[in-house]
Amino acid sequence: MAGRSNIVVSATVRDALAAGAPVVALESTLIAHGLPRPRNRDVAVELEELARARGVTPATIAVIDGVPRVGLDEPDLRRIADDANVIKLSVRDLPVACATGWTGATTVASTALLAARVGIRLFATGGLGGVHRGAGDSFDESADLVTLAAMPITVVSAGVKSILDIGATLERLETLGITVVGYRTSTFPGFYLPHTTYDLDWRVGDAGQVAATMAAADLLGLTSAIVVANPLPTDQALDPALHDRVLADALAWATERGIRGKAVTPFLLETFHRETGGASLEVNINAVRNNVAVASDIALAWAAKDRSPTDPAAPDPTAPDPAAPDPTAPDPAAPDSAAPDLAGPDPSAPDPAAVARAHRP
């Protein structure tokens, strides 16, 4: 049969998962398409080392020659970083790429899908895709949203880029049943900026609270993602005045040039990079670094919870078996002296035979 599609998990990642050790998934689109060469390769290695330094196994995900791989070795990571022919693969592209033997970098959506398929519960990325500006006319919405609605994975991100429609994105996340929590923040971050004008319903204070939320979601049988919105520290974010000026100019230029639909977002990103003198690129890298650190902490908390005998998500061995009968309860098969036996004769009723004899002539 032509094509290959079985997911191959590296030995390191496979052993970590089997042992219940912490694992964090990493996307490869940032490496292949989000950063300039050769810095992209250095950042890819740095992010993996950042996870390892915290005691977590990194699992960078990509498709190599038609085979989805969870955990890349050094040659594969170098290939994703250096080869200009590496394509960008979202969920819809995976079956074709696998069938035809292509090599591609995975987006947030396809990374989340492949990670969840092999049992990875944590995923760190820079920012989520979302609803694009003007989506009311173009229907341009990232596949990240609908994919996360069906994947039981926790994604740590710095929100969504301010070039997107943040309000509409939050509405879609709510509609799709995706839990969103702010990590030590009550406002949704805007990727380049630590805060936006959009308030969040839920705030968590540490990695343990996120792990507890994951356990509660499992108990409820939920199969959608949890999005952990982790804002950049103020000193690592883009200058707010510069951000607002560049965004206003970029939107105006897009309108003047008749740029619409799917062409808007790449134009805005390119404009941000040019007009900020590359500062937006540094923000992007800082965001991913911070998110890998937080995702690693959550993965550690999740692994500890999974192994703990007091894990609220695990059954209590000292609790009574709900399937076993209660020894203090009355035997439902025994007659109840306080209730009439509907199947037996009523002793207070007259004997029909005696009544018949009394009326015999």
Swiss-Prot record:
GO molecular function: hydrolase activity, acting on glycosyl bonds; metal ion binding; pseudouridylate synthase activity
Record key words, sorted: Glycosidase, Hydrolase, Lyase, Manganese, Metal-binding
Residues holding Mn(2+): D140
GO cellular component: cytoplasm
Source organism superkingdom: Bacteria
Alphabetized Pfam families for the sequence: Indigoidine_A
UniProt cofactor(s): Mn(2+)
Record family assignment: Belongs to the pseudouridine-5'-phosphate glycosidase family.
Protein name, entry field: Pseudouridine-5'-phosphate glycosidase
Organism in which the protein naturally occurs: Frankia alni (strain DSM 45986 / CECT 9034 / ACN14a)
